[in-house]
Structure formats: structure tokens, C-alpha cells
């Protein structure tokens, strides 16, 4: 697994669920400029690594019910985010919000779970009519839109509630758009 920082100058490589190596793209052939070693949870494998859009944080997702938030360039563990379900041992996506203030994760219970990145405290659970495990969560980096998916796609926008403004929108889990306050 690998991820570029928002500037596109540094990339992180997660190796064998044990270490993260940071490389500078201008001199990656010289090897990593920093390596961090971790153990997350026994029985969990890492499934993803991501930088926050402000470049200050990284997250490690797992096939367990744990997301780890790290300081991006010192490698210091900040928070372990838990409280969501992954009782199937599958890859569940988590994403930073565009302002880097929150992490949102899917869950095998069909819900989305939200945590603050400054405290690690869970601040909300969103129910969006997903009938299967929510395995993907992504944010539009410029507009206030979040997408979540199981076998169907839900689009979330600020404003609260399910809307059926013209043109009519169907709600999830049928193909369509779900609007919910984020």
C-alpha cells in the first residue's frame, strides 16, 4: 500500500503491516528518509495508508475494527479509532474530511462512524440506509460531498435529511443519491 502527501513530493509505503517508509519522490532511489515500525492489533493486517489533505496526519486502516491515526512526518501514534464493526475481516475504507478535522469510516453494520482528528473522540454515527457493509468512503476535495458505498452508492451533502427536490432523487440502497447532514 502506498499514498502520496497532498503536495505530491512525499510518498508513504506500508510494508507487511509492520512499518511505514517515507520517500521523497525527488530522491526515492536513495531509499526512505524515514522508517516507522508499529504493531497495531494482533490478528489485524493493514489494508490502507492515507495522508490527510493538510499533510499533517496519516491513517492506517486494517481488516479489523481499528483505524490508527499517526503524525505524518514524525510517525508518532496519535489515536486508535475504534467502536465500529468489522466482524467479517474485510477491507473497510476510511477517509479524512477535506478540512482534515474528522475521519469517517464505513462499517459492517451499514453505518458510517465519525471521529475528531484532534482528540480521537467518536462524534457521530450516520445511518444511510446501506443494507450491506459500507466498504468505501471518499470525499470530494473541493465540494461538500461525501460518497459511501456497499453494493449501492450514497452521496451525502450538508443540509440535513433526505431530500426529493426536483429532479426527484431516489434514496439508497437503490441506485441514486442520499442526502444527509454530515
Identify the meaning behind each predicted range.
Residues 104-111, 117, 135:
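C-terminal transmembrane module of eukaryotic multi-pass membrane proteins
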Residues 6-7, 53-54, 98-99, 141-142:
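Residue-level detector of Asp-centered blade-edge/turn motifs that repeat once per structural unit
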Residues 79-103:
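A surface-exposed beta-alpha-beta supersecondary segment
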Residues 91-92, 121-182:
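Terminal intrinsically disordered, low-complexity extensions flanking WD-repeat/beta-propeller proteins
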Residues 14-17, 61-64, 106-109, 149-151:
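Conserved strand-to-loop turn within each blade of WD40 beta-propeller repeats
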Residues 1-4, 42-50, 88-95, 132-138:
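Canonical WD40 repeat/beta-propeller blade segments in eukaryotic WD-repeat proteins
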Residues 7, 16-40, 69-79, 114-124, ...:
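Per-blade loop-tip surfaces of WD-repeat and WD-like beta-propellers in eukaryotic adaptors/scaffolds
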Amino acid at each position: 500500500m502506498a499514498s502520496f502527501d497532498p503536495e505530491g513530493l512525499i510518498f508513504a509505503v506500508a510494508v507487511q503491516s509492520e512499518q511505514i517508509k517515507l520517500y521523497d519522490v525527488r530522491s526515492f532511489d536513495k531509499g526512505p528518509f524515514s522508517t516507522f515500525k508499529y504493531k497495531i492489533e494482533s490478528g489485524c493486517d493493514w489494508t490502507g495508508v492515507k495522508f490527510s489533505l493538510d499533510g499533517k496526519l496519516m491513517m492506517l486502516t486494517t481488516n479489523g475494527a481499528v483505524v490508527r491515526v499517526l503524525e505524518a512526518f514524525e510517525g508518532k501514534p496519535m489515536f486508535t479509532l475504534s467502536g465500529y464493526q468489522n466482524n467479517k475481516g474485510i477491507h473497510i475504507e476510511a477517509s479524512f474530511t477535506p478540512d482534515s478535522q474528522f475521519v469517517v469510516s464505513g462499517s459492517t453494520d451499514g453505518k458510517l462512524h465519525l471521529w475528531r482528528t484532534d482528540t480521537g473522540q467518536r462524534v457521530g454515527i450516520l445511518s444511510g440506509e446501506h443494507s450491506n457493509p459500507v466498504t468505501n468512503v471518499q470525499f470530494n476535495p473541493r465540494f461538500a460531498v461525501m460518497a459511501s458505498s456497499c453494493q449501492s452508492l450514497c452521496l451525502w451533502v450538508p443540509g440535513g435529511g433526505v431530500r426529493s427536490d426536483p429532479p426527484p432523487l431516489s434514496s439508497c440502497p437503490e441506485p441514486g443519491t442520499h442526502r444527509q447532514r454530515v
